[in-house]
Amino acid sequence: MPPVVVLIGPPGAGKSTVGRALASRLAVSFEDTDDVIEQRAGKRIAEIFLTDGEAAFRQLEKAVVADRLAAHTGVLALGGGAILDDDTRALLADHTVIYLEVEFSEAVRRVGLNRDRPLLLGNPRAQLRALMDARRPLYEQTATHTVGTTGRTPDEVADEIAALITVREENR
């Protein structure tokens, strides 16, 4: 049985926080593929980027996402860049995928720009803006639903997603 729902979105969208709240509401488990990657690699994502490079990280991410899409039955949050891979996007076509959309200023506030985020090195504000702009079309193309998170609590967002899932299941 596949995940109940898959959450995608940029850093700061609330994938992990909303995912935990949603899993609690649905009485299912929650997994974040970034956590699974770190467990399997035995090191933090930032360290993987520094020691092995982004290409090696993306290969590991692709394998973990494919595995968890096949095996996890709860709420699954993907890392922000997972949708960059064509094969991953193809796998997601068979799932309920929620794009957690967030305004840039809110993402900056949530991420903090001083955190352990390897793709935001250098000028973090400019890097985050470029990353969000480049990935937005892929998030929109991949998602079955888009839910805004700006100015909302994780509980409000989780409630909206739970309602969407219920309606979707009733219409199947």
From Swiss-Prot:
Residues where ATP binds: G12, A13, G14, K15, S16, T17, R117, R152
KW Oxidoreductase (keyword) present: no
GO terms classed as biological process: amino acid biosynthetic process; aromatic amino acid family biosynthetic process; chorismate biosynthetic process
Species per Swiss-Prot/TrEMBL record: Acidothermus cellulolyticus (strain ATCC 43068 / DSM 8971 / 11B)
Protein name per UniProt: Shikimate kinase
Subcellular localization(s) per the UniProt record: Cytoplasm
Entry GO CC: cytosol
UniProt entry keywords in alphabetical sequence: Amino-acid biosynthesis, Aromatic amino acid biosynthesis, ATP-binding, Cytoplasm, Kinase, Magnesium, Metal-binding, Nucleotide-binding, Transferase
Known role: Catalyzes the specific phosphorylation of the 3-hydroxyl group of shikimic acid using ATP as a cosubstrate.
